[in-house]
């Protein structure tokens, strides 16, 4: 390499450093560890049952790069546990109809509360735009989620038999001998598969409280709220599953053998169908952030450029 080429390279380095060093004058690197606790729920079109919210919990490790005091980027990894489902209170269905003295009598089974809950463990990778102020920060951006383990739980509380007299519009639970009533609770568990990759929109608003400030580093305790919404619609993952339980009773010499329909099976019936659903989380977040010392800040402020 001759002298002319070396001079050209040094000039290019000078131009690059003159543009880059002022930009680094306010650059900051943040390392964060956080805990999220809140509510998970489904957004779905359904009239027969109601969504049942439950717990969402997650941990997050992330790295943020702020090229200025206003704009930055954040990337990281999260481990989340979501639980939500659907439920129906006062579930009633007909077992059979019999005639006694030319009067139809309807034998039903009733369930005080019928629920189906889905629990998902997942790993997420968020990539968010950071808008920061003096002590307030707002993050928003996409999040790629990889489900790891998905389970479901069906349970029925306070299930019993009853007899309904249509002409009198009267329902009897205990006194009629043919409806040997029995109250019980039953639970069934299983696993299912969901989409391998899901896209979410993640947002967070937080307030930073300085904890430690020194010449070479800073640390903050961050308190805020978060809201994550799934952009990937989930379809029914257990379309061929059998029913929830078997109800049988032989008291008073009247045998009864009936499969109780699960919530998901009921949802597939005509207008009761929930063809797809979206999961969302909302809650509080507590995190600890560390901003290590950046020696380039001092060099940028003093415009010290070094060449070789």
Regions found by a protein language model. Name each.
Residues 29-35, 71-77, 121-125, 136-146, ...:
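Transmembrane beta-strands of outer-membrane beta-barrel proteins
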Residues 60-64, 126-132, 206-210, 285-289:
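Transmembrane beta-barrel domains of outer membrane proteins
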Residues 1-28, 291-308:
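Cleavable N-terminal export/targeting peptides
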Residues 35-43, 65, 79-83, 119, ...:
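Transmembrane beta-strands of outer-membrane beta-barrel pores
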Residues 140-145, 206-210, 307-308:
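Exposed, low-structure sequence patches enriched in small/polar residues
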Residues 41-54, 82-120, 147-198, 233-281:
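Extracellular/periplasm-exposed beta-strand and loop segments of Gram-negative cell-envelope proteins
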Residues 27-28, 66-73, 131-135, 210-223, ...:
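Short loop/turn motifs that connect adjacent beta-strands in outer-membrane beta-barrel proteins
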């Amino acid at each position: 390499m001759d002298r002319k080429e070396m001079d050209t390279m040094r000039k290019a380095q000078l131009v690059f450093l003159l543009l880059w060093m002022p930009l680094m004058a306010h650059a900051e690197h943040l390392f964060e560890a956080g805990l999220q606790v809140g509510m998970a729920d489904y957004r779905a079109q359904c009239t027969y049952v109601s969504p049942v919210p439950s717990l969402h919990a997650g941990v997050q490790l992330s790295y943020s790069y702020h090229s200025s005091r206003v704009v930055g980027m954040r990337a990281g990894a999260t481990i989340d546990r979501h639980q939500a489902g659907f439920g129906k209170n006062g579930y009633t269905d007909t077992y059979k109809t019999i005639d006694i003295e030319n009067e139809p009598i309807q034998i039903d089974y009733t369930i005080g509360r019928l629920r189906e809950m889905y629990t998902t463990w997942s790993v997420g990778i968020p990539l968010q735009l950071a808008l920061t102020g003096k002590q307030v920060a707002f993050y928003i951006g996409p999040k790629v989620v990889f489900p790891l383990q998905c389970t479901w739980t069906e349970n029925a509380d306070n299930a019993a038999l009853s007899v309904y007299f249509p002409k009198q519009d009267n329902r009897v639970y205990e006194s009629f001998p043919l409806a040997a009533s029995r109250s019980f609770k039953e639970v069934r568990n299983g696993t299912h598969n969901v989409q391998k990759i899901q896209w979410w929109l993640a947002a967070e608003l937080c307030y930073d409280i300085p904890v430690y400030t020194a010449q070479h580093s800073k640390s903050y305790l961050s308190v805020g709220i978060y809201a994550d919404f799934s952009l990937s619609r989930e379809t029914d993952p257990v379309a061929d599953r059998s029913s929830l339980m078997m109800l049988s009773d032989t008291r008073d010499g009247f045998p009864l053998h009936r499969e109780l329909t699960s919530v998901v099976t009921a949802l597939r019936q005509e207008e009761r169908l929930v063809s797809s659903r979206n999961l969302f989380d909302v809650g509080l977040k507590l995190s600890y952030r560390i901003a290590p010392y950046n020696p380039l800040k001092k060099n940028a402020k003093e415009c010290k450029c070094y060449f070789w």
